[in-house]
């Protein structure tokens, strides 16, 4: 009687373990699971810019490349035959006064950069489209905002760099695979 109960427990444990392993077979572990496994290299051409501010597209491209190298398993390459291509265009940059003193002197400025990005694979198919978020086109619009307070020695360039860094973080976060 005792061996029959032991055999039944052993069989149940074995079946449970097999079901558990089969159910978790599609999961990946670690930070590599955040990114598509079939992509290893990314080509990031210079972002285009509709802005009249100088060097804005160069600075954003550089920030995106650094962010990709820092936070993803991808290698940024300089050739267009990479596994994927991340393109972008700066649509607008806006500087507005947030706080003024009683004499109409600027005390705080807000700099916003608006861009659209597209990440496609070698065949031209969109990568990383969000399953829950309906995106009708291959382009995703993002914005990054920075603040400059002249009283603290911050210039407009400081606010622009803050907006560029935030924009680069958002662009790279789009490269993550949705849950």
Where are these regions (language model features)?
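Bacterial N-terminal signal peptides that target proteins for export
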Residues: 1-13
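A structural "domain/chain start" motif
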Residues: 22-66, 70-81, 125, 164, ...
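N-terminal start-of-chain detector that recognizes signal peptides
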Residues: 18, 47-48, 56-63, 84-92, ...
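Membrane-targeting and insertion segments and their boundary/processing signals
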Residues: 10, 30-38, 58, 89, ...
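Residues embedded in well-ordered secondary-structure elements
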Residues: 13, 33, 77, 104-106
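Second-shell loop/turn segments in exported
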Residues: 48-54, 150-160
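Surface-exposed short loop/turn segments
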Residues: 70-74, 85-155, 165
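Bacterial N-terminal signal peptides
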Residues: 11-23
């Amino acid at each position: 009687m005792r061996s029959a109960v032991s055999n039944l427990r052993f069989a149940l444990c074995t079946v449970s373990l097999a079901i558990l392993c089969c159910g978790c077979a599609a999961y990946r572990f670690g930070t590599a699971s955040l990114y598509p496994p079939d992509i290893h290299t990314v080509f990031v051409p210079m972002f285009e810019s509709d802005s009249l501010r100088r060097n804005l597209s160069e600075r954003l491209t550089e920030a995106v490349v650094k962010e990709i190298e820092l936070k993803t398993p991808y290698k940024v390459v300089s050739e267009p035959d990479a596994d994927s291509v991340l393109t972008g265009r700066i649509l607008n940059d806006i500087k507005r006064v947030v706080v003024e003193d009683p004499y109409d002197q600027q005390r705080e400025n807000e700099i916003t950069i608006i861009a659209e990005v597209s990440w496609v694979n070698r065949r031209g198919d969109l990568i990383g489209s969000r399953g829950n978020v309906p995106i009708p086109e291959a382009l995703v619009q993002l914005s990054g905002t920075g603040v400059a307070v002249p009283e603290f020695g911050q210039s407009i360039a400081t606010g622009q760099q803050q907006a560029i860094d935030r924009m680069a973080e958002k662009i790279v976060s789009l490269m993550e695979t949705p849950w």
